[in-house]
Amino acid sequence: MKSTKKILAALASIGLVLTLAAPMLAAQSFKSPDDVKTALKLLVQVSNDFKRQINNKNFARVPHEFMEYTEAADALRGAIKNEPADFKNKVETRLKAAVAAYQKVSDMSAKATDPQPLMAEHAKAVTAMNSLFDLFPADYRPDPNLPPPGRGGAKKNP
């Protein structure tokens, strides 16, 4: 009886470890890893552009940034199109939430005269975006504090 309990406990432990490790293992073997990294980087860059436009009180430009954000979201969808359905569904759910949050910032910008409410809403959008990024391995997630190439960022070698 005791040995049966020990075996069941060991199997349960192994099952738990495999269950927890499976998403991480699946996520680390993307079929298009460079495309995934590029799409995630684009999302961060456009988010930073949102912030810059709001801080500069260039509210009329914010809807254009939203359009670019949706293009970056589509790039991510394309980058993961050959991944397992379960992973794609998780990404799509969080991606839709992030896009909706950035759309709210864009919609608010039409009547904005003060950057503070937009910045508060932008912070919520960033939280939604970070929730999306949590689905990806840490080495795929871009550093939001690095400027993009061409704006003081790293230059690519030809």
Predicted features along the sequence, with ranges:
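Immediate post-signal-peptide N-terminus of mature secreted/exported proteins
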Residues: 26-67, 141-144, 148-158
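Surface-exposed, polar helix/loop patches in the mature regions of secreted/periplasmic/lumenal proteins
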Residues: 86-145
